[in-house]
């Protein structure tokens, strides 16, 4: 959240919006751990670079005593995603904030802090945004995808994400979260994302019923054991996964609007 504050001070949200799992966790109380920061430009700009915002991020981190550096990732020339990392020494920061702690309990954490953030520099049209205000770590403003647009991104991920040939369980968990909170989907954004991914043809007569059919087909193909194993490390109440099955996901998809 300190990184988000630094980006805000640098004017980043005049040209980009926040979306993805971490946006859900921070602003909509998704009960799943997520730390990567995902953004999309408000309009395509293939020449966009993140470097101009690095100083703002580093200054914000240093204001809170965090000695972290920001570095960019070499971009694949054919990719629409530009990436950067915030990195630092975990041990240094544990000692700084908890000088009397027994470090044995942090054995699993004693590696470099590494937060990835990615920006889609050529996003499809159709997203809807809202401006939100955060008071902590200090007052700042963020441009955020609407809940409906966030849901569109999640459905696109379920249908199209190429993740080691498997469905990412975290996507399924978030799908249940959206439906449980009665969030409708931004159908225009889903359509445009699916067209961009060559999942559907541009001339298709696309509507909510067609989308449900695509999801039902997908939910019939998923290995739910593997999907559960993916999400287990990121949630506290693992019993909520017991019901996961083809029939469960097909049934709740009837509630999609």
Where are these regions (language model features)?
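Structured mid-to-C-terminal alpha-helical surface segments
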Residues: 1-16, 27, 42-257
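Glycine-rich beta-strand-to-loop/alpha-helix junction loops that act as flexible
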Residues: 19-22
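Short glycine-biased active-site loop of nucleotidyltransferases that positions the nucleotide triphosphate
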Residues: 25-34
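Structural signature of FAD isoalloxazine-binding scaffolds in flavoprotein oxidoreductases
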Residues: 37
């Amino acid at each position: 959240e300190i990184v988000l504050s630094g980006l805000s001070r640098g004017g980043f949200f005049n040209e980009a919006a926040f979306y993805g799992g971490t946006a859900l966790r921070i602003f909509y109380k998704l009960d799943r751990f997520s730390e990567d920061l995902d953004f999309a430009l408000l309009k395509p700009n293939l020449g966009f670079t993140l470097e101009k915002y690095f100083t703002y991020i580093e200054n914000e981190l240093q204001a809170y005593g965090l000695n972290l550096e920001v570095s960019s990732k070499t971009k694949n020339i054919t990719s629409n995603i530009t990436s950067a990392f915030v990195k630092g020494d975990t041990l240094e920061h544990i000692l700084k904030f908890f000088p009397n702690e027994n470090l044995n309990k942090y054995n699993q954490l004693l590696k470099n802090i590494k937060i990835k953030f990615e920006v889609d520099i050529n996003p499809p049209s159709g997203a809807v945004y809202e401006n939100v205000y955060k008071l902590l770590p200090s007052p700042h403003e963020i441009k955020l995808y609407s809940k409906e647009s966030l849901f569109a991104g999640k459905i696109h991920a379920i249908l199209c994400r190429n993740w080691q040939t498997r469905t990412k369980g975290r996507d399924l968990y978030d799908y249940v979260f959206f439906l449980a909170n009665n969030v409708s989907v931004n159908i225009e954004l889903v359509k445009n994302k699916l067209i961009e991914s060559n999942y559907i043809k541009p001339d298709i007569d696309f509507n909510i019923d067609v989308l449900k059919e695509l999801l039902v087909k997908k939910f019939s193909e998923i290995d739910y054991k593997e999907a559960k194993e993916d999400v287990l490390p990121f949630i506290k109440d693992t019993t909520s996964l017991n019901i996961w099955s083809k029939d469960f996901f097909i049934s709740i998809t009837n509630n999609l609007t």
